[in-house]
Amino acid sequence: MTDIKPMQLGEILDGALTIYRRNVGLFSMLGIIALAGPLIFFAFLSGPLTRSFLPLAEQLRVGRQPSLDQWQPMLPFLGLVLLGMILYYIASYFLAAGAMRIISDTYLGRRPQLGDAISLGASKMLPLVGVALCKVALLTLLWIGCVIGIVVLATIMGLIGKGVASLAAFAGFVGAFWFAAFVMCGYGVTTQVLTLEEGVGVFGAFARSWELTRQRKLKVFWTALVSGIVFYFIPYVVVLGVAAALQGISPPLGRVVGALSQFLPIVCAPLIVSALTLLYYDLRVRREGFDLQILSQRLGVG
């Protein structure tokens, strides 16, 4: 068994890569099961969406503002994009729960099974959807509150002068970003809490996450940011760069590589989940002496 111990950011990222490498087949299968539907939906939608937007893009390019009637053909596609985003968002929570089972079994020295991962993900879907909806509502309220606050601040400072108003607006944006990041980092491990702790409901998961991240929100922020850059942004840049380079050499091959880039979340998403799950273990170890016996009991492993 691998000991659960306090970890620094580098150890969390290294541990996530190690666990992923050991179970790459399982993570890939789980990613395909969870995300293939939404990603295929987006792949089929991208062609018609692009073709419908091209006339509008041409008008915008030459400096003309399209009329409302010209935008109307885009509305059905925008509705489908919203539907796809909702499906992807919910599917990502199923993937997260299943991936946590694989990660936890790896820590316990057991051989992870795809069936166990799917079973845990399916059993947690209803409360995880609740968490997902609560996070969307929270982000929406934060966005509305921050916008209102910035507008009011800029308006008041505008009575002094335009320069002061601009400075106040900039300070407001910085403050709003900090506040939103602070709140979301506080609720950064709600999915892990709901999946890996017994008897915790949706709202209890938010309270529990806030308690675990107390005085550790900066670590949550850096873990999420760095893992997002390393496991998402850099792979996308590399793949899209290769696709662009191949376009000049072999356009069909370039298009194939570009199309495959849409399926990168199948590979990348489990890495993000692994990093955040190891962060959750780290937070519990530091606060509660979390160990393998507790994890084993939670998963029902003898």
Q: What is each residue range found by the language model?
A:
Residues 18-21, 66-75, 118-123, 161-163, ...:
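Helix-boundary and loop/linker segments of multi-pass membrane transporters
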Residues 36-39, 90, 94, 132-140, ...:
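Hydrophobic alpha-helical transmembrane bundles that constitute the permease/transmembrane domains
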Residues 53-72:
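Perimembrane loop-to-helix junctions flanking transmembrane segments
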Residues 1-54, 111-115, 176-255:
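Nonpolar helix-loop interface/hinge motif
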Residues 33, 83, 134, 138, ...:
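Hydrophobic residues within alpha-helical transmembrane segments
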Residues 284-302:
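Short, highly charged, low-complexity non-transmembrane loops/tails of multi-pass membrane proteins
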Residues 76-77, 81, 115-143, 169-177:
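Alpha-helical membrane-spanning segments of integral membrane proteins, especially the hydrophobic core
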Residues 1-5, 40, 44, 73-110, ...:
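Selective recognition of hydrophobic, aromatic-rich stretches within alpha-helical transmembrane segments
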